């Protein structure tokens, strides 16, 4: 299957009317800039995954669960696990695929638990998830009743992990595409809810990012924004001169009052804080499915309230806001 056919199939008109014409040229332009060197091997891996008919699917529990009654004996299960482990590292999860538990670096279900009761109900809504990783939250959005979910993330391995999960889940109105927000059409005003989680602090211009998100929302649509914050009054912003928790590309970490004012200045209405939580080593950690260093390695061993660079340890805030 060609790359074009692969992504055109994800954007099937019955689920995403009009989006093939808008997004496919942008995906093709992205691939013209160069593919990841492992892309052919990943496509071969996807093509060789066993075909197991799902009989039970649950996108509303902590682990996105896909099960089947037949066609998944021990040998098949071992084959599936071997293939999925070749897609290491798994950053977001957990997943339970035919009894194979993918214990990803992030307990992404904990973040979902913090926001699910506060956001506008997703039933019947068209959703965009910016910086979606491998699509764990996109499946949870579908489980919460979303009509359709488009996730975008420029990391090709994350897209391949989504495609592997989708292979076993079947055809659902959810797609993860290899695009960044800067590649997405401006001012579509097409979505009822837009999520941006773990993206804002990676942007050199946070205001540009907020304006891009606003342009994706219909009037009255809801933004769900999750990002790193520091404690402090309005006006306080941490601008790391070097790394932050070993991340090179952290540009701005505002206080919650500062972020609220940014949302208002960017044109959003009714900005409100719904949660602030420290990131713990129970939520982000190394596992058998993500064997590299993780949060525990990035904190000061003598004072875990600081990063190894001396900055305040990660705290994350969730804001809701309404598009005008």
Curated annotation (Swiss-Prot):
Q: Which reaction does it catalyse?
A: carboxy-S-adenosyl-L-methionine + 5-hydroxyuridine(34) in tRNA = 5-carboxymethoxyuridine(34) in tRNA + S-adenosyl-L-homocysteine + H(+)
Q: What is its EC number?
A: 2.5.1.-
The molecular function terms in GO held by this entry are: methyltransferase activity; transferase activity, transferring alkyl or aryl (other than methyl) groups
Task: Name the enzyme group at the top EC level.
Answer: transferase
UniProt-listed InterPro entries: CmoB, Mo5U34_MeTrfas-like, SAM-dependent_MTases_sf
State where carboxy-S-adenosyl-L-methionine binds. 92, 106, 111, 131, 153-155, 181-182, 197, 201, 316
GO BP, sorted A to Z: tRNA wobble uridine modification
Keyword terms: Transferase, tRNA processing
Q: Which Pfam families match?
A: Methyltransf_9
Indicate yes or no for the key word Coiled coil.
no
Q: Which domain of life is it from?
A: Bacteria
Task: Provide the function of this protein.
Answer: Catalyzes carboxymethyl transfer from carboxy-S-adenosyl-L-methionine (Cx-SAM) to 5-hydroxyuridine (ho5U) to form 5-carboxymethoxyuridine (cmo5U) at position 34 in tRNAs.
Which protein family is named in the record?
A: Belongs to the class I-like SAM-binding methyltransferase superfamily. CmoB family.
Note the subunit structure: Homotetramer.
- What this protein is called in its record is tRNA U34 carboxymethyltransferase
Q: What is the lineage of its organism?
A: Bacteria, Pseudomonadati, Pseudomonadota, Gammaproteobacteria, Methylococcales
Q: From the UniProt record, report the name of the gene that encodes this protein.
A: cmoB
């Amino acid at each position: 299957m060609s790359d074009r056919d692969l992504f055109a199939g994800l954007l099937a008109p019955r689920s995403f009317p009009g989006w093939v014409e808008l997004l496919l040229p942008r995906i093709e332009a992205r691939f013209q800039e160069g593919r990841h060197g492992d892309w052919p091997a990943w496509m071969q891996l996807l093509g060789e995954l066993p075909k197991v008919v799902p009989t039970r699917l649950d996108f509303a529990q902590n682990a996105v669960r896909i099960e089947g009654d037949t066609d998944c004996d021990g040998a098949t299960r071992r084959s599936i696990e071997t293939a999925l482990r070749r897609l290491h590292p798994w950053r977001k999860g957990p997943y339970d695929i035919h009894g194979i538990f993918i214990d990803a670096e992030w307990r992404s279900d904990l973040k979902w638990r913090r926001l699910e009761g506060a956001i506008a109900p997703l039933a019947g809504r068209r959703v965009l998830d910016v910086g979606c990783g491998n699509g764990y939250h996109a499946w949870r959005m579908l489980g919460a009743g979303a009509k359709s979910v488009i996730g975008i993330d420029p990391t090709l391995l994350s897209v391949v992990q989504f495609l592997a999960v989708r292979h076993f889940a079947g055809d659902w109105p959810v797609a993860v595409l290899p695009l960044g927000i800067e590649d997405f059409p401006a001012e579509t005003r097409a979505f009822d809810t837009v999520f941006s989680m773990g993206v804002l602090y990676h942007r050199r211009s946070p205001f540009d990012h907020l304006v891009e998100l606003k342009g994706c929302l219909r009037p009255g649509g809801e933004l769900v924004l999750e990002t790193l914050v520091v404690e402090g009054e309005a006006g306080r912003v941490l601008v790391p001169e070097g790394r932050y928790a070993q991340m090179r590309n952290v540009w701005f970490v505002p206080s919650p009052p500062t972020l609220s004012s940014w949302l208002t200045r960017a044109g959003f209405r009714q900005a409100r804080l719904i949660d602030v939580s420290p990131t713990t080593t129970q939520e982000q950690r190394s596992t058998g499915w993500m064997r590299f260093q993780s949060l525990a390695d990035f904190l000061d061993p003598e004072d875990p309230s600081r990063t190894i660079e001396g900055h305040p340890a990660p705290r994350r805030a969730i804001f809701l806001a309404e598009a005008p």
